[in-house]
A protein has these predicted regions:
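Conserved beta-loop-beta element that borders a ligand/cofactor-binding pocket
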Residues: 92, 131-155
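Conserved Rossmann-fold NAD(P)-dependent oxidoreductase catalytic core, especially the SDR/UDP-sugar
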Residues: 8, 63, 67-122, 145
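Conserved glycine-rich Rossmann-like NAD(P)H-binding loop of the short-chain dehydrogenase/reductase
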Residues: 4-15
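Glycine-rich "substrate-gating" loop/helix at the edge of Rossmann-like oxidoreductase active sites
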Residues: 119-122, 150-159, 176-189
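Substrate-positioning beta->alpha
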Residues: 75, 129, 162, 179-199, ...
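Mid/C-terminal beta-alpha module of Rossmann-like enzyme folds, strongest
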Residues: 194-262, 279, 295-329
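NAD(P)H-binding glycine-rich loop region in Rossmannoid oxidoreductase-like domains
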Residues: 14-21, 25-71, 79
Length: 329
């Protein structure tokens, strides 16, 4: 919009649209799982950004993940190609990548393709299948570029996302300790710019990791302590702790009480996995740049606190210490 483009947002019927409030965006309700509903939707459009996916750790209807993430992706790209759209930017995820190198202390990149049988949970599995379907369509001529974001942090995290929930749990004093893992922290604004760079400079059928700074869990919690003034979580749990807690939560809350576990197994598996990534391809080929993790985490924490997500007792303890402004590098 800042470049003068007319923007149309295709939304799942009934989906929240608070992030679009006040923006000059035309919103249309479309069920992407039904190809017929997309007929004519892209007429007159030059570009398409496929940004959304079905996500969750405790799906009530696992088949709906496949319908949205796989069939929906196929339907959207098919309709866009049929309408003559010049370029499609498809948002995949680094969750489709193999992580064997991270065990040796090396970050994964776009060439580290996972084996589907090694991916845990409906989201990862359906995004993997969807990504390979998109690559197949690109090989057949669809003008698609793929962006693989890492862990997004920053403002406007209404739901919140799993990465945002880590920040929120810290703010509310719900992280008594941590497992020594690592992850890639990216500012959501940098990820948005990465999508625009993929539109402008990306090669058809090529995937680009857009990320930020690789940090350990201990570093992440230390940064949050520095920028908020809250005490750091210092207790270190063994690497097996998340999965043990997840299995107990699954059995008691999921199997016995038939409600969403507070610690879903998929979330537990992610919490015990090192997920570091190398975004050199996007930097070299697209000119992608990112800001430090401290800025992303500070803006995430500040937004949650300013919008009523943090309990009053903890808000009273906050003493903000913003990191020094620095341009993305």
């Amino acid at each position: 919009m800042g470049r003068g483009a007319d923007v149309v947002a295709l939304l799942e019927p009934g989906a929240a649209r608070s992030n679009l409030d006040g923006l000059d965006v035309e919103c249309r309700d479309v069920d992407v799982t039904v190809a017929k509903h997309l007929e004519g939707v892209f007429d007159g459009a030059r570009f398409c950004f496929h940004l959304a996916a079905k996500f969750g750790f405790w799906p009530k209807d696992p088949a709906h993940f496949y319908a949205v993430n796989v069939n929906g992706s196929r339907n959207v790209i098919g309709a866009a190609v049929e309408a003559g759209v010049e370029r499609i930017v498809y948002t995949s995820t680094v969750a489709t990548l193999g992580l064997w190198k991270t065990k040796a202390g090396q970050p994964s990149n776009e060439d580290d393709i996972a084996d589907l049988s090694h991916l845990f949970g409906n989201y990862k599995q359906t995004k993997y299948v969807a990504e390979h379907e998109v690559l197949r369509l690109a090989a057949q001529g669809a003008p698609v570029v793929l962006v693989l974001p890492t862990m997004p942090h920053g403002p406007f995290d209404h739901r919140p996302t799993p990465s945002g929930k880590v920040v929120l749990d810290y703010l509310n004093g719900r992280i008594p300790g941590f497992v020594e893992t690592a992850m890639n922290v990216a500012h959501v604004d940098d990820l948005a710019k990465g999508h625009l760079l993929a539109l402008e400079k990306g090669s058809q059928g090529r995937s680009y990791i857009c990320g930020g700074e690789n940090v350990s869990m201990a570093q992440l919690l230390s940064i949050l302590s520095e920028v908020t003034g809250l005490p750091p979580a210092k207790r270190r749990f063994p690497s097996t702790f998340p999965m043990i807690a997840g299995r107990l939560s699954q059995f008691i809350e999921g199997d016995l009480l038939h409600r969403e576990p507070r610690i879903p197994l998929e979330a537990a598996q992610m919490a015990s996995t090192t997920m570091t990534f190398d975004d050199s391809r996007a930097r070299d080929e697209l000119g992608y740049r990112s800001r430090p993790a401290a800025m992303a985490l500070y803006e995430s924490a500040r937004w949650f606190a300013d919008h009523g997500y943090v309990n009053a007792e903890r808000v009273a303890q906050l003493h903000w210490n913003p990191p020094k402004e620095s341009p993305p590098s």
